[in-house]
UniProtKB/Swiss-Prot annotation:
Its EC number is 1.14.14.38, 1.14.14.39. Belongs to the cytochrome P450 family. Pathway: Secondary metabolite biosynthesis. The gene is CYP79D1. Residues 1-21 are cytoplasmic. Its main location: membrane. GO terms for molecular function: heme binding; iron ion binding; isoleucine N-monooxygenase (oxime forming) activity; monooxygenase activity; valine N-monooxygenase (oxime forming) activity. It catalyses: L-valine + 2 reduced [NADPH--hemoprotein reductase] + 2 O2 = (E)-2-methylpropanal oxime + 2 oxidized [NADPH--hemoprotein reductase] + CO2 + 3 H2O + 2 H(+); L-valine + reduced [NADPH--hemoprotein reductase] + O2 = N-hydroxy-L-valine + oxidized [NADPH--hemoprotein reductase] + H2O + 2 H(+); N-hydroxy-L-valine + reduced [NADPH--hemoprotein reductase] + O2 = N,N-dihydroxy-L-valine + oxidized [NADPH--hemoprotein reductase] + H2O + H(+); L-isoleucine + 2 reduced [NADPH--hemoprotein reductase] + 2 O2 = (1E,2S)-2-methylbutanal oxime + 2 oxidized [NADPH--hemoprotein reductase] + CO2 + 3 H2O + 2 H(+). The keyword Iron-sulfur does not apply. The synthesis of cyanogenic glucosides is mainly in the top of the plant and then cyanogenic glucosides are transported basipetal in the plant to the tuber. This is Valine N-monooxygenase 1. CDD domains: CYP79 (cd20658). GO terms for biological process: cyanogenic glycoside biosynthetic process.
Length: 542
């Protein structure tokens, strides 16, 4: 049952997280807007009441919206919005609610049963995506796959990805490039030990992911000269920082996404962050793509070496290039943005949790010694036999998701989820945070416990029952779950097999507090790594 305005305001005051310096300006704008169209509001309310009376099922519960603008004042006032939404659902004791932002129905879900209704039973209905500034910027004008509305362009690009780019055969073809970056990870961490430095696990994990994708796409690790110790140079740091900025603001509750007439005013500052981050990513990548296209045109390049070559050489039925340069550039940018975050975030958190529970760290290392031994380095071929290591990663995905919500699924027609009516155009989002921590699904949900995943046969990182979200599922699910699983497992396995990890000197316990406006550790996790294998097994060059 929807709450009245006074109840809602009381709830908001109780769950306030932060205030923006621009609140007063925005409030004035909304008050002026409200006064100027009061007569229209009355008409809309009457129309909505008549329409509501014709429905057989109620809308999901939620806060009473203000006329026309919905709950945008609350969205602005109580930043970060995702924490306000999760607290709202907790206080309402509901696994589904409906929050009105402008004319958009935002429907978060934190129950696996309802999540499966959306992405399995009603997958075809919820296959669309919303149009927002962040999605348009990431996709170069909706030329790619992940954030593109359900249309012919999406069908074309997804078919190319699944058949030519992310296929099992292509994954096998690119194995050696991934292996090079697993070796470079060990080289980099070993050099931190030689220099008597702690390892910044955020730096190590994020740049391992960036290195893997750059090597698979461009056959190179560095945009610049790189660093002698195998770590990122200034160019790679700027590039990866831009990737994570683009991710932070993707569907980030930007005001103009819900009130499009405000686009360009950048009232909450998000528009500049989005545009600048996506420009930085392309400033590094596009010159390499242009150069490679010219090499193929001139005949200088004749053999395929990486994914960029595959994109460029794809032909249509008439023998013409299947993709335009803009499609290639933007799809590669989207691949970079979409593949680095999940593995790096999960393993930074996993290492922090395991450092605070050394018995888990010990058990995972013992599994590696038993399955792989100490006479060679762990390889991708070992992954099927490393169930406990995978359980450690899987538990990090559950407890510490990289994003609060998954990418929105827009209803293409009126439908029913649970016992609630969901109008056409609603944004249904799975709460990654809420699903993974739902006490109705998980016992002791805030405890990091890999053992909870060890009684299900072979451990995998995918979760098709949607008890939590790793790579999602359905026709709009991640097409690169095999790649993501390999990157995640190899990252953790190499770190555990090759080094003994301890907290930094004078630190007895790793701080696992979350950043307020993200789900990353508030302080990047650092630890000291000591080699535990024979010296000849450690790579000696980047």
């Amino acid at each position: 049952m929807a709450m009245n305005v006074s109840t809602t305001i009381g709830l908001l005051n109780a769950t306030s997280f932060a205030s923006s310096s621009s609140i007063n300006t925005v409030k004035i704008l909304f008050v002026t807007l409200f006064i100027s169209i009061v007569s229209t509001i009355v008409k809309l309310q009457k129309s909505a009441a008549n329409k509501e009376g014709s429905k057989k099922l109620p809308l999901p519960p939620g806060p009473t919206p203000w006329p026309l603008i919905g709950n945008i004042p609350e969205m602005i006032r109580y930043r970060p919005t995702f924490r306000w939404i999760h607290q709202l659902m907790k206080d309402m004791n509901t696994d589904i609610c409906l929050i009105r932002f402008g004319r958009t129905n935002f429907v978060p879900i934190s129950c696996p049963v309802l999540a499966r209704e959306i992405l399995k039973k009603n997958d075809a209905i919820f296959s669309n995506r919303p149009k927002t500034l962040s999605a348009k910027s990431m996709s170069g004008g909706y030329l790619t796959t992940i954030v593109v509305p359900y249309n012919d362009q999406w069908k074309k690009m997804r078919k190319i990805l699944t058949s030519e780019i992310i296929s099992p055969a292509r994954h096998k073809w690119l194995h050696d490039k991934r292996a090079e970056e697993a070796d470079n990870l060990v080289f980099y961490i070993h050099n931190q030990f030689k220099a008597n430095k702690n390892v910044n696990l955020r730096t190590a994990t994020r740049h391992y992911g960036g290195n893997v994708i750059r090597k698979m796409v461009f056959s190179k690790r560095y945009f610049g000269k790189g660093m002698p110790d195998g770590g990122p140079g200034p160019e790679e740091i700027e590039h990866i920082d831009a990737v994570f900025t683009a991710l932070k603001y993707l569907y980030g509750f930007c005001i103009s996404d819900f009130l499009p007439f405000l686009l360009g005013l950048d009232l909450d500052g998000q528009e500049k962050f989005v545009l600048d981050a996506n420009k930085t990513i392309r400033d590094y990548q596009n010159p390499l793509i242009d150069e490679r296209i010219q090499q193929w045109k001139s005949g200088e390049r004749k053999e395929m070496e990486d994914l960029l070559d595959v994109f460029i050489t794809l032909k249509d039925s008439d023998g013409n290039p299947l993709l335009t340069p803009d499609e290639i550039k933007n799809q590669i940018a989207e691949i970079m943005i979409a593949t680095v975050d999940n593995p790096s975030n999960a393993i930074e958190w996993a290492m922090g949790e395991m450092l605070n529970q050394p018995e888990i760290l010990k058990k995972a290392t013992e599994e590696l010694d038993r399955v792989v031994g100490k006479d060679r380095l762990v390889q991708e071929s070992d992954i099927p036999n490393l169930d406990y290591v995978k359980a450690c990663a899987r538990e990090a995905f559950r407890l510490h998701p990289v994003a609060h919500f998954n990418v929105p699924h827009v209803a293409m027609e009126d439908t029913v989820i649970g016992d609630y009516f969901i109008p056409k155009g609603s944004w249904a989002v799975l709460s990654r945070y809420g699903l993974g921590r739902n006490p109705k699904t998980w016992s002791d949900p805030l405890k990091y416990d890999p053992e909870r995943h060890m009684n299900e046969g072979e451990v995998v990182l995918t979760e098709h029952e949607l008890r939590f979200v790793t790579f999602s599922t359905g026709r709009r699910g991640c097409v690169a779950s095999l790649l993501g699983s390999c990157m995640t497992t190899m990252l953790l396995a190499r770190m555990l097999q090759c080094f003994t990890w301890t907290p930094p000197a004078n630190v007895s316990k790793i701080d696992l507090a979350e950043t307020l406006d993200e789900l990353t550790p508030a302080t990047p996790i650092s630890a000291f790594a000591k080699p535990r294998l024979a010296p000849h097994l450690y790579p000696t060059s980047p």
